[in-house]
């Protein structure tokens, strides 16, 4: 989107624009020169007009579907808004008298951050993950806020000359949104906890509490400082609308609107959430066969080829469907634009159902020695890679042992996972440079010259949502720059105080590269609900820059990933605050508070677990004979991870003994990328056997293919402007990203999730826009809320009752949860044993 010269707002211009919007025109009008009308009379006219329009708006909402136009938009002022999904969901009502940062906000934010961080950290050291769902927190906070509004005293106090009260009145939507945003700031365990636990449990380096917390805080907050640089591109323009937050806005509207208008919406949401909660017990616990219905495997029963092609847990998942919402929700099908999911589906289908089967059955890269869809790391004989065989007692690389043993090997699908990851990162950056480079440079050039209290984008000047909040004070650029500088200074000091092996220039370089990736990734995230990130690039870059320094690699990887992700998290939350009409200052305070409080809880809970349980229990180093067990590289040990928890849940076999799987994966990653290094993994010239690595082509060809695909698209755009290439629903970066999702996640996710996307964002949105506008997001939020609540209940039940080898909470085995093959895809007698369990 090209930026035009900025025109400052005036009262007169606002008035004329209001009338322009009332007539449905998406164009900027100029000031009237009529000197016969005073500014006061104009304001009176506008206020009277606003009252009438508010009454009209209330009438529209009272009549439900009858008030929606053909596109599902209730407010005529928004009929030409550039993003119809926003116009259908976000209303134009704002009450500046509503309290925002109240005592209730601080109280509930603190409660939920403490509860959420404690639960997520406990399960960080369990074999399966449980966290408080954002929708559950949103629902509970709604009722808790109403309870506080009725119970707290309303008597005002005066402190330091400032008048305040514990209870300013009605529980408002803005307060509610700030509590949820503060919780989001720490809803997941801080990513830096992985390296800290790996350093202590494997490398014997225990950081003191002040420096450990400093590490966690700086990795979480550094990215926030970049938001000031990018908010004019990633937050203000209407086109940057963040599809994933619209369901949250829809739920806020249902909870805080006029009960006469929203009662039916709330009833529908509660009915859907309740039904989902009841149903989800079937695939999650009682009848897990519903999680995976491998039709091809059933039809071809007895054939090992059909087993490999059709199994969704061990094979390629062709014709595998799921009736488990946890799998169906994989692509966020009710929230993500259909064109984005179509790109991901095309990439995944080409990789999983065509490329991988052909390569596997032709034994490419020795595929037949490994499971077809495994994300584990193996040795050349096909067994799980044993890191302890190549490490000295001081946890350094034993080069002789490495040459006698093996360099890492992967299944063909997991090797291609890295190829697609490199290609998606390259394509993402190339696309932003070629198609949006001029706009980006112009916006960045004006960052420091923009007035923090005025609209900063020509489209923002025409945006009716901006006009509702144009009088709110904006956070100056200098405050974001100060936050960034403080985090970098503290982070640099912590590197040396904590002996993190990373030099000061390494931190600055990693943050700079992450900042460069943030903008193209953010543009994709804000429009397509797809976040590519820096997972692949940061690991390879850190390993290449700091070979032989595993702790430095872990540290650099965390900063590289978190700076980008946290910047986009705050940008997304700023957009949510914009939709909820929350001033930027108040939102930033709430977000930083939640993010700042979380690391203290993460570290305290981790210390309690490690000090009480010990390393042996957490790492499973003691076998039944009391001997130390060798450490193999588990799922995702080479840099990926995930998906295994869903398979374990579907099988209904939960063990709750302590098991620091995530910590093991961080250690394994530090060995592969830090101790051995990318040169050995992808082939190098050091004279070792790894110089002939079968993966030496992955990195250069991945980056080249990604850039070449976008370059070809750009050349077509230049050669044939009439074809309007930029309007094609085709994005190479998203296609490659879709291919990279597997085998990290089970292929059971793919078919059913795409079918739900077509039904919602395709059929219902196009052919039933009124139904879509009113119910789609509430349907998705209700299904997510109910399904996630079941996982929370099961997780807590397993934690409390299934301890010390006891299985008090378990479903008796029956036909619907077979102990051998929960999906009834039984392995045939001639199935190669390596597919079921590596040696």
Swiss-Prot record:
Residues 44-58 have a biased composition (Basic and acidic residues). The keyword Protein transport applies. Keywords: Glycoprotein, Membrane, Peptide transport, Protein transport, Transmembrane, Transmembrane helix, Transport, Virulence. Residues 1-58, 629-654 are annotated as: Disordered. It is a multi-pass membrane protein. It is found in: Membrane. It comes from the Eukaryota. Glycans are attached at residues 33, 36, 386, 398, 749. One of its GO terms (biological process) is protein transport. The chain crosses the membrane at residues 105-125, 177-197, 210-230, 268-288, 315-335, 345-365, 415-435, 478-498, 505-525, 585-605, 665-685, 697-717, 728-748, 781-801. GO terms for cellular component: membrane. Residues 629-646 have a biased composition (Gly residues). Oligopeptide transporter; part of the gene cluster that mediates the biosynthesis of the phomopsins, a group of hexapeptide mycotoxins which infects lupins and causes lupinosis disease in livestock. Belongs to the oligopeptide OPT transporter family. This is Oligopeptide transporter phomP2. It comes from Diaporthe leptostromiformis (Lupinosis disease fungus). The lineage of its organism: Eukaryota, Fungi, Dikarya, Ascomycota, Pezizomycotina. The gene is phomP2.
């Amino acid at each position: 989107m090209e930026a035009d010269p900025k025109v400052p707002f005036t009262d007169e211009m606002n008035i004329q624009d209001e009338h322009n919007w009332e007539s449905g025109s998406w164009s900027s009008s100029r000031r009237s020169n009529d000197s016969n009308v005073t500014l006061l009379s104009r304001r009176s006219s506008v206020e009277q007009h606003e009252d009438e329009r508010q009454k009209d708006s209330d009438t529209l909402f009272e009549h439900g579907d009858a008030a929606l136009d053909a596109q599902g938009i209730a407010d005529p002022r928004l009929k030409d808004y550039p993003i119809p999904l926003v116009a259908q969901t976000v209303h134009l009502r704002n009450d500046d008298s509503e309290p925002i940062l109240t005592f209730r906000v601080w109280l509930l934010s603190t409660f939920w951050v403490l509860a959420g961080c404690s639960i997520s950290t406990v399960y960080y050291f369990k074999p399966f993950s449980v966290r408080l769902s954002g929708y559950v927190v949103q629902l509970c906070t709604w009722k808790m806020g109403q309870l506080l509004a009725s119970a707290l005293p309303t008597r005002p106090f005066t402190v330091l000359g400032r008048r305040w009260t514990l209870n300013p009145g009605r529980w408002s939507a803005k307060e509610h949104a700030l509590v949820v945003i503060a919780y989001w700031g720490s809803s997941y365990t801080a990513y830096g906890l992985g390296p800290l636990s790996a350093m202590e449990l494997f490398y014997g380096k225990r950081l003191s509490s002040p420096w450990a917390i400093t590490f966690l805080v700086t990795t979480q907050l550094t990215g926030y400082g970049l938001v000031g640089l990018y908010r004019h591109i990633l937050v203000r323009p209407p086109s940057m609308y963040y599809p994933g937050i619209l369901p949250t806005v829809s739920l806020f509207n249902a909870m805080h609107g006029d009960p006469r208008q929203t009662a039916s919406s709330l009833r529908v949401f509660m009915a859907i959430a309740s039904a989902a909660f009841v149903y989800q017990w079937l695939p999650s616990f009682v009848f897990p066969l519903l999680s995976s219905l491998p039709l091809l495997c059933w039809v071809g029963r007895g054939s090992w080829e059909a087993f490999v092609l059709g199994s969704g847990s061990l094979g390629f998942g062709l014709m595998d469907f799921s009736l488990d919402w946890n799998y169906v929700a994989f692509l966020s099908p009710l929230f993500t634009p259909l064109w984005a999911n179509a790109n991901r589906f095309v990439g995944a289908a080409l990789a999983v159902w065509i490329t991988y089967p052909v390569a596997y059955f032709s034994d490419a890269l020795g595929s037949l020695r490994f499971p077809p869809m495994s994300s584990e790391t193996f040795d050349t004989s096909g067994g799980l890679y044993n890191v302890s065989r190549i490490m000295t007692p001081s946890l350094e690389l034993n080069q002789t042992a490495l040459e006698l043993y093996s360099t890492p090997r992967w299944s063909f699908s997991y090797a291609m996972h890295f190829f697609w990851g490199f290609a998606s990162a390259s394509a993402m950056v190339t696309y932003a440079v070629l198609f949006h480079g001029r706009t980006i440079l112009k916006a960045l050039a004006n960052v420091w010259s923009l007035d923090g209290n005025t609209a900063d984008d020509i489209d923002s000047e025409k945006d009716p949502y901006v006009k509702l909040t144009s009088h709110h004070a904006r956070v100056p650029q200098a405050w974001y720059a100060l936050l960034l500088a403080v985090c970098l200074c503290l982070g640099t000091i912590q590197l040396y105080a904590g002996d993190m092996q990373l030099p000061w220039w390494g931190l600055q370089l990693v943050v700079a590269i992450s900042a460069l990736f943030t903008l193209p990734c953010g543009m994709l995230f804000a429009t397509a609900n797809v976040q590519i990130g820096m997972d692949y690039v940061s690991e390879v870059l850190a390993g290449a820059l700091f070979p032989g320094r595993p702790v430095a690699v872990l540290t650099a990887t965390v900063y590289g990933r978190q700076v980008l992700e946290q910047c986009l998290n705050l940008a997304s939350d700023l957009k949510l605050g914009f939709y909820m009409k929350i001033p930027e200052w108040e939102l930033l305070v709430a977000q930083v508070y939640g993010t700042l409080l979380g690391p203290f809880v993460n570290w305290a809970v981790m210390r309690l677990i490690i000090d009480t349980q010990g390393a042996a229990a957490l790492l499973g180093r003691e076998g039944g004979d009391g001997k130390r067990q060798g450490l193999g590289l588990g799922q995702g040990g080479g840099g990926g991870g995930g998906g295994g928890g869903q398979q374990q849940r579907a099988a209904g076999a939960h063990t709750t003994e302590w098991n620091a799987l995530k910590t093991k994966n961080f250690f394994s990653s530090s060995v592969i990328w830090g101790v051995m290094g990318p040169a050995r993994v992808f082939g190098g010239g050091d004279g070792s056997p790894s110089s002939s690595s079968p993966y030496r082509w992955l990195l250069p060809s991945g980056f080249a293919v990604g850039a070449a695909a976008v370059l070809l698209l750009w050349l077509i755009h230049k050669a044939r402007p009439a074809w309007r290439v930029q309007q094609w629903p085709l994005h190479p970066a998203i296609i490659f990203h879709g291919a990279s999702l597997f085998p990290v996640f089970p292929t059971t996710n793919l078919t059913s999730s795409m079918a739900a996307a077509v039904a919602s964002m395709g059929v219902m949105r196009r052919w039933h826009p009124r139904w879509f506008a009113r119910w789609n997001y509430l349907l998705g939020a209700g299904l997510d809320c109910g399904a996630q609540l079941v996982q929370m209940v099961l997780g807590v039940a397993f934690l409390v009752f299934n301890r010390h080898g006891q299985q008090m909470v378990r479903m008796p085995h029956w036909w619907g949860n077979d102990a051998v093959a929960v999906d009834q895809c039984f392995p045939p007698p001639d199935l190669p044993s390596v597919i079921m369990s590596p040696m």
